[in-house]
Amino acid sequence: MPLRVTVLYCGAUGYKPKYERLRAELEKRFPGALEMRGQGTQEVTGWFEVTVGSRLVHSKKNGDGFVDTDAKLQRIVAAIQAALP
């Protein structure tokens, strides 16, 4: 059963391409192992929240910014590796 990774992003802010880049990178690293779900908000929220399983692992709202550095990506990758059987 694939591991669910959910990204809640600000649709009104135009963050969908950022979600698409993250999704492509994670699917390349974990082929067939993830169920990626992206949800854009209707209103301006500024959100870019990444949840692995039921655990929030990256939050722009809480100060993490975008997934724009290798260190931020590695934190998400590590959370996925820890959650996979």
UniProtKB/Swiss-Prot annotation:
Chain residue numbers at which the record places covalent cross-link Cysteinyl-selenocysteine (Cys-Sec): 10-13
One CC-aspect GO term: cytosol
One Pfam family per UniProt: Rdx
Chain's role: Plays a role as a glutathione (GSH)-dependent antioxidant. May be involved in a redox-related process. May play a role in the myopathies of selenium deficiency.
Entries under NCBIfam families matching the protein: CXXU_selWTH
Family: Belongs to the SelWTH family. Selenoprotein W subfamily.
Protein name: Selenoprotein W
Source organism (scientific name): Gallus gallus
